[in-house]
Amino acid sequence: MRFLLVSTHVDQTTGYSKVSHNLLKQISTLSPKVKTFHFGFQRHPGRSSVRKVPEGVITYDAAANEDPKEEGFGFNKIHEYVEMVNPDVVMIYNDPLIVMRFIESMKHERGKSSYKLWIYLDQVYEGIAQPLIETIRDHSDRIYCFSELWKKKFLEYGSFPDVRVLEHAVDPTVFSYMPPSSVASVRTNLNIPSDAILFLNANRNSQRKRLDLTLGGFARLLARNPTKPYHLLILTNASPQSGAFYDLQRVFIEELKGQGLDVQTHVRKLLLIDSSPPNLMSDEAINQIYNASDIGVNTSDGEGFGLCQLEHMYTGAPQVVTDVGTYSSFLNSNVAEFIPKNGRTYFAGSMPHGLWAPTFSMESVADGMEKSIETLEDKRKAVSKYTFKSWSTVCDSWLEDVLTCGAPESSVSVQVLS
């Protein structure tokens, strides 16, 4: 059986690349019954050797082979690559727009093409544009959603052949709890006071991630507690050339002024770590930052899963998140504070990924941050008792699907990798 995954190259630093790596690591355990190929796109030439392709997986660098050069996705190469590999199953993993473009470039026809087409769909907002939904519905044989919530939302678009759930998980070989002495050393290197309560937002600097809400909420937290040792670390792309949406330093200064705070006194309580190219944040470095931070924050107005929050919590940190729905698949009030919605805003008609997004106030963000400090010890205890799913657990049924699709025999067995 020949299986082809079309997704972000593992030699990247995004959440997509982490998930791709773990999916490939799991499916590689099915060798020799399953021969796995990876059409890996958007590999950044300046960020080589971030992580290795799992043993036994045959990978193709779509960005390097594009001709002519486009966006690094390899749309002009996917059709000939599929014909060359001759797979039994192709699974595309990305957002609806990218999925649609691959489907169109592959020229797949359900029931006529020689392979089955599966979609691992990243949904972040409700109300995906109808042309994208129709393309996915008309061409795919099976769709995997990140959670039961997103499966339910997706089924509201109409009738689909087969919709299932494939969650995310934490890789314990990469992320782990560090002893206090090591954490103290990391905080010293970051110039974080030993008595500080450190918040962390490690999300991309895009409009959807709403880092402005984090900054405004933190400024209001400082206004309520001007003498407390509260600090915020934001690990993100800060350079406009790398696609950064917010000018984080200017936003924070503006919010401090708006709260009547002395800028010189409080601006130093924000630490920015720029992950823009050519800077490289390895998984090991991110694990150190996770461990050095007391509480995680995500103020996104739309989220597919929230892998940063799951990873950070795995190292022992409670979370503060916007109530966008998807977090309820792995977070509860024992380990997280949920920032309530106060309305919605509609997107421009050209927005393909959704019709609207929930809105949140900076005051509510400050409330969540303040409450997380007040309940920090209780939440830490709850996190220590939390049962985390492994990649082998979340991929178990998916691997069964792969074997069942490729094998004529009635029974198959799966040996999964922890």
Where are these regions (language model features)?
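N-terminal subdomain of nucleotide-sugar transferases
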Residues: 1-47, 85, 392, 396, ...
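Conserved donor-binding/catalytic core segment of Leloir-type glycosyltransferases
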Residues: 5, 193-209, 215-218, 232-234
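Carbohydrate-associated surface elements
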Residues: 42, 149, 169
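A short helix/loop element that forms part of the nucleotide-sugar donor recognition site in Leloir-type
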Residues: 176-192
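Nucleotide-activated donor-binding/catalytic signature segment of Leloir-type glycosyltransferases, i.e.
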Residues: 245-288
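Aromatic "clamp/platform" in nucleotide-sugar-dependent glycosyltransferases that forms part
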Residues: 301
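A charged, aromatic-enriched C-terminal amphipathic alpha-helix characteristic of glycosyltransferases
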Residues: 359-364, 374-404
